[in-house]
A protein has these predicted regions:
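C-terminal/domain-terminus segments
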Residues: 7-17, 120-132, 141
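Nucleotide phosphate-binding site architecture
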Residues: 115, 133, 157
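Short Gly/Pro-enriched loop/turn and capping motifs at secondary-structure junctions
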Residues: 131-133, 147-148
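Hydrophobic, membrane-inserted alpha-helices
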Residues: 47-48, 126
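Terminal amphipathic alpha-helical/low-complexity segments used for targeting or macromolecular assembly
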Residues: 1-41, 45, 147-190
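Flexible, glycine/small-residue-enriched loop-and-beta-strand segment within the central core
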Residues: 50-120, 146, 152-154
Length: 190
C-alpha cells in the first residue's frame, strides 16, 4: 500500500473516531481527544472546540490558550483547485495550503468561516456568521462578510461585568430567564 493511501486511511479513521467522540462524549472529552492525539499543530489549555467537522489539514492550525470555537465554524486551510486543474491536462498539481493561528483569549462565533493565512487575536472576538479573510487585530471584535472591526474586546469585557456596590458580580443567564424575557419584549415595543 502506498504512503498516500496509508495517510488517507489514517485520516479517515481519525475523522471517524472524532465523530464518535462528538456523538457519544461531552465537550471535555472532545478537548482531551484533540490534545492527546495532537490533531492540531498546537492546542493549548482551557479551550472549547464545538464543531463536529474537523478541518481537512488540522496540522496547519494552531490554537493557543483559552480559545472558544463555537459550533459549525469552518476552517479553510487549503483549497481543492489542484484536483480540478489535474482533470484539465492530466498532470498532478501541488495542493495550496495556508496556516491559521488563533491566539489566547479569543472567541469564534458559530457558523463563521476562517480563510487560511490569517491570525486571530489575542483578546479577539469573531461574531457569529462572519467570514474572516484577513488578520483580526488584538483586542478587536469583527463581524460580517468580509469581517470588519465592529467593536472593542475591552469595552465588551467591561460591559459584560455587572457592578453593585462597587463589586463585580458574575451571573448565569439561566437564573435570570424571566428578567431577560421582559427585556426582550420591551426592546420589541421600541
Amino acid at each position: 500500500m502506498s504512503q498516500y493511501k496509508r495517510n488517507l486511511r489514517k485520516k479517515k479513521w481519525m475523522k471517524f473516531k472524532w465523530i464518535l467522540v462528538c456523538t457519544f462524549k461531552g465537550v471535555k472529552a472532545r478537548n482531551r481527544y484533540l490534545k492527546k492525539n495532537h490533531i492540531f499543530a498546537q492546542y493549548g489549555e482551557n479551550n472549547l472546540f464545538q464543531p463536529m467537522k474537523l478541518p481537512n489539514a488540522p496540522q496547519l492550525i494552531k490554537i493557543h490558550n483559552n480559545v472558544k470555537v463555537a459550533a459549525d465554524v469552518t476552517f479553510y486551510e487549503h483549497d481543492a483547485i489542484n484536483g480540478m486543474l489535474s482533470v484539465i491536462d492530466g498532470k498532478r498539481y501541488q495542493m495550496h495550503g495556508s496556516c491559521i493561528e488563533i491566539f489566547d483569549n479569543s472567541f469564534i462565533g458559530g457558523h463563521s468561516i476562517i480563510i487560511g493565512n490569517v491570525s486571530i487575536g489575542p483578546n479577539a472576538i469573531v461574531a457569529a456568521g462572519s467570514v474572516v479573510t484577513k488578520d483580526v487585530a488584538p483586542g478587536t471584535i469583527v463581524g460580517g462578510n468580509p469581517a470588519k472591526v465592529i467593536g472593542s474586546f475591552e469595552k465588551l469585557h467591561e460591559k459584560r461585568k455587572m457592578t453593585e456596590c462597587g463589586e463585580t458580580l458574575v451571573y448565569d443567564p439561566r437564573d435570570r430567564a424571566d428578567e431577560l424575557w421582559e427585556q426582550f419584549y420591551a426592546s420589541l415595543k421600541k
